């Protein structure tokens, strides 16, 4: 069984190496501040670094994620803040010769609607025109088994449109707790974007002893969260000794607006 698993992994590596020669040049996130009724343009440059031509297609997808690590890339629309219907792409299919580049143009047509507010987003997904099909012959105890695998490598470019400076900015602290993983101790902070604009920030945890004296600030990872989505942050507090503490959790990245919460800590091991 171990040999079979290793053979499958090796097969996947061989079959995907070809399309892996296609790369996206430039930023993978395109942000636009827009007005209702406006038209905005952009270009995605695809490069074929291989020695064979590759056929590609560009598809519009909607994208959502949550704090549990679930990601949804699905045909639009799957949420009310999708801008996929506003976007046109040319070409949507093409063949890229070896060693050459392809310019994919897109236009964003913002609807003339007064009720547009906040952030809207979607994904332009670059993938092979047909899934790569690879076959291999696996041998085990004088038995032969032919397996066919379909493998798809995708490159995603996010298209974000903000309607001016409109829309509310608001987050919700869903859960805070101490967790242990990989021999270290963390404060896990789950945050949901309940506003109308995308946000990017990192939580900062300041811990106080029973006398109210600060014993240090501990930064978590940074993340971007779209409206209705959520993310999980971890702040390493392994160096904090056993004891009871109070923690103040605040978020940066919101200018003069600060979001925060408090929690009690009981570190026992």
Residue locations for each model-derived region?
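Short, solvent-exposed loop/turn segments enriched in Ser/Thr/Gly
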Residues: 26, 37-43, 102-104, 115-123, ...
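Extracellular Ig-like/FN3 beta-sandwich strand-entry sites
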Residues: 39, 53, 101, 117-119, ...
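Short acidic, flexible loop segments centered on an aromatic residue
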Residues: 56-79, 192-211, 253
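Terminal connector regions
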Residues: 52-64, 109-161, 242-269
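Sec-dependent N-terminal signal peptides
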Residues: 4-18
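Intrinsically disordered, low-complexity Pro/Gly/Ser/Thr-rich segments with frequent PxxP/GP/PP motifs
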Residues: 77-113, 210-241
């Amino acid at each position: 069984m171990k040999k079979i698993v290793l053979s499958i992994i090796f097969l996947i590596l061989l079959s995907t190496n070809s399309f892996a020669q296609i790369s996206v040049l430039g930023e993978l996130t395109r942000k636009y501040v827009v007005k209702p009724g406006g038209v905005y343009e952009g270009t995605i440059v695809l490069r074929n670094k291989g020695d064979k031509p590759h056929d590609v297609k560009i598809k519009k997808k909607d994208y959502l994620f949550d704090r549990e690590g679930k990601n949804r890339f699905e045909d639009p629309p799957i949420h009310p803040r999708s801008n996929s219907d506003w976007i046109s792409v040319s070409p949507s299919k093409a063949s890229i010769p070896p060693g050459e580049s392809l310019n994919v143009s897109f236009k964003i047509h913002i609807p003339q609607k007064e009720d547009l507010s906040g952030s809207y987003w979607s994904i332009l997904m670059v993938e092979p025109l047909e899934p790569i099909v690879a076959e291999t012959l696996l041998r085990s105890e004088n038995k032969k088994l032919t397996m066919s695998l379909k493998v798809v490598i995708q490159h995603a470019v996010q298209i974000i449109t903000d309607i001016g400076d409109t829309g509310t900015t608001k987050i919700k602290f869903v859960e805070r707790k101490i967790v242990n993983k990989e021999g270290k101790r963390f404060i896990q902070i789950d945050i949901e974007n309940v506003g109308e604009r995308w946000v990017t920030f990192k939580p900062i945890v300041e811990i106080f002893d029973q006398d109210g004296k600060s014993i240090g600030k501990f930064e978590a990872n940074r993340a971007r969260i779209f409206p209705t989505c959520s993310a999980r942050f971890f702040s390493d507090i392994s160096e904090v000794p056993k004891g009871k503490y109070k923690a103040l959790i605040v978020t940066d990245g919101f200018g003069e607006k600060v979001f925060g919460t408090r929690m009690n800590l009981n570190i026992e091991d």
